From Swiss-Prot:
Metabolic or biological pathway, per its Swiss-Prot or TrEMBL entry: Purine metabolism; IMP biosynthesis via de novo pathway; 5-amino-1-(5-phospho-D-ribosyl)imidazole from N(2)-formyl-N(1)-(5-phospho-D-ribosyl)glycinamide: step 1/2
Protein's UniProt keywords contain Hydrolase: yes
Keyword Transcription regulation among record annotations: no
Enzyme nomenclature, EC number: 6.3.5.3, 3.5.1.2
UniProt keyword list: ATP-binding, Cytoplasm, Glutamine amidotransferase, Hydrolase, Ligase, Nucleotide-binding, Purine biosynthesis
Pfam families: GATase_5
Gene encoding the protein: purQ
Protein name: Phosphoribosylformylglycinamidine synthase subunit PurQ
Catalytic function, reaction form: N(2)-formyl-N(1)-(5-phospho-beta-D-ribosyl)glycinamide + L-glutamine + ATP + H2O = 2-formamido-N(1)-(5-O-phospho-beta-D-ribosyl)acetamidine + L-glutamate + ADP + phosphate + H(+); L-glutamine + H2O = L-glutamate + NH4(+)
Amino acid sequence: MKSAVVQLPGLNRDCDMIAALTKISGKAPVTVWQTETEIPDVDLIVIPGGFSYGDYLRCGAIAARMPVMQAIKAKAEQGVRVLGVCNGFQILVEAGLLPGALMRNASLKFVCREVKLEVVNADTAFTRAYAKGQVIRSPVAHHDGNYFADAETLKAIEGNGQVVFRYAEGTNPNGSVNDIAGVLNAKGNVLGMMPHPENLIESAHGGADGRGLFASALDVIAA
């Protein structure tokens, strides 16, 4: 499968994401700049982490209004898989591709550490390599990862299986409601998550717990 990594001013995890996608699929992803109005024929689009536009206004608010986002929305409507990690998650929420909002961490501090994630839904295009209830490790590094949604939205996403990852008990780093760490859109082809799976894909680098997400999304589960 072919993949693309979106590049915007201030994003600084694009190289990590490119390395992860290349390692898992054996093919280097194409890169797409913020001003592009068309995206090549790919199967997976990734918006990596960082601090797009310095996080001014709100995290992801300016990036969500760049020309490339209209192209991403069009691809998502066609069923192309879209993954947003950390700032990428914030951008997808600001663009209206995912429900909820991401607020300042409850501690009011930047958090950079490893957490444990529970795989809540293993029957998705992004989690088929995992088992439901499996607990995996993943790094986090963010200041505004506190996921919030109103009661009606929470009921809907919990009931529809759109909550994909939850911080394991006692490891919630930011105060996210219901310990939510990653959510899908209703269609199931757009995933946003605050943790960084791209930083744990090789045992030599501390672990490979994140590998399953990319293997699932790229249809290379046996990789």
